[in-house]
């Protein structure tokens, strides 16, 4: 799902309530924290041409190789900066999920697209991460003469952490008999 139902209802002001309980697949265990999530795409445009003369072209796939290497460095930087023992995987993740480029083995790749997913820790902000990624990609591809476009595939869900002594968390823990848990997926919270 697009996990936008609760947000839409809140924006419409209906119904007016102090809080809401949103059903998620957690075995009735209340969620006190979840990672944020975003899905984006990096689109690179080079210059295609025949493979017999690469000097007349600009290979977008080779540029994407450099971008991927930098994204993997960024992933390690985030891992060292953001840690929380609340989560089974105690650091942010960046998954390189899908790559498409080129149109024929005997042609220089003129375009290459990379789709990725990130799971953000509390304290990380979606737009700041997106700005960091755009800056890093520009740093890699601008000297290569490659055009870059950034696309948001899913607006994202910010990371969540329940306020200390949350009345709603205490009530749901009491009603379910379960202590609040942290999950690595985004909820509508």
Please annotate each region the language model reported.
Residues 40-47:
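The feature captures the short pre-catalytic strand/loop hairpin that immediately precedes
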Residues 1-39:
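Acidic/histidine-rich catalytic neighborhood of metal-dependent amide-processing enzymes
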């Amino acid at each position: 799902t697009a996990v936008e139902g609760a947000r839409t209802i809140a924006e419409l002001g209906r119904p007016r309530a102090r809080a809401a309980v949103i059903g998620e697949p957690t075995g009735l265990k209340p969620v006190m924290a979840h990672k944020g999530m975003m899905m984006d795409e990096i689109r690179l445009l080079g210059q295609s041409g025949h493979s017999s003369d690469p000097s007349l072209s600009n290979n977008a796939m080779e540029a994407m190789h450099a971008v991927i290497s930098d994204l993997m460095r960024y992933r390690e930087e985030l891992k060292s900066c953001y840690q929380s023992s609340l989560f089974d995987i105690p650091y942010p993740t960046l998954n390189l999920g899908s790559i498409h480029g080129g149109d024929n083995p005997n042609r220089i790749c003129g375009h290459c697209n990379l789709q990725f997913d990130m799971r953000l820790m509390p304290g990380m902000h979606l737009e700041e991460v997106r700005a960091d990624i755009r800056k890093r990609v520009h740093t890699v591809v601008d000297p290569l003469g490659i055009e870059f476009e950034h696309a948001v595939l899913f607006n994202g869900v910010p990371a969540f952490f329940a306020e200390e002594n949350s009345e709603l968390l205490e009530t749901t823990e009491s009603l379910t008999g379960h202590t609040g848990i942290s999950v690595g997926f985004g909820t509508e919270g």
